[in-house]
Regions:
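Alpha-helical assembly-interface signal, strongest on the long, hydrophobic N-terminal helix that forms
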Residues: 1-52
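Short, conserved structural patches
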Residues: 45, 49-118
Length: 118
């Protein structure tokens, strides 16, 4: 039993580390989507573009870029980021790209946002 455990334990640790990294990627993707949504909602309400971007950056993972564009009465927010690979034994695995887009209709009476990038 000891020899089998000695062989299985490193495999279990590697699988656990890989699953933890996949969970981190999933959480990063959710945060990226939330950042795009929060920014789009704020702009649809008529908030200033700088304030809306600041709100989105509070939610986004570090290093995420938010960009705003407007098409008629629609506000489009794109969030792009990257999460590092797991490193260590998994050094060959590249990082993951995080992407999210959110579209919102400008509310009646709200000033439209200006083009902005951050």
């Amino acid at each position: 039993v000891t020899a089998e455990l000695a062989l299985a334990l490193p495999v279990l640790l590697a699988v656990t580390a890989g699953l933890a990294w996949l969970l981190a990627v999933a959480v990063g993707q959710i945060r990226t989507l939330d950042a795009a949504r929060e920014t789009a909602r704020a702009l649809a309400r008529g908030d200033d573009a700088a304030a809306a971007l600041a709100l989105g950056e509070q939610v986004a993972p570090p290093g995420t870029r938010l960009s705003i564009s407007r098409s008629g009465d629609r506000v489009v927010v794109r969030a792009r980021g990257r999460i590092r690979g797991p490193g260590g034994l998994f050094g060959a695995i590249p990082g993951a790209t995080l992407r999210a887009d959110a579209v919102a209709l400008t509310e009646p009476g709200a000033d439209g946002p200006r083009e902005a990038d951050r």
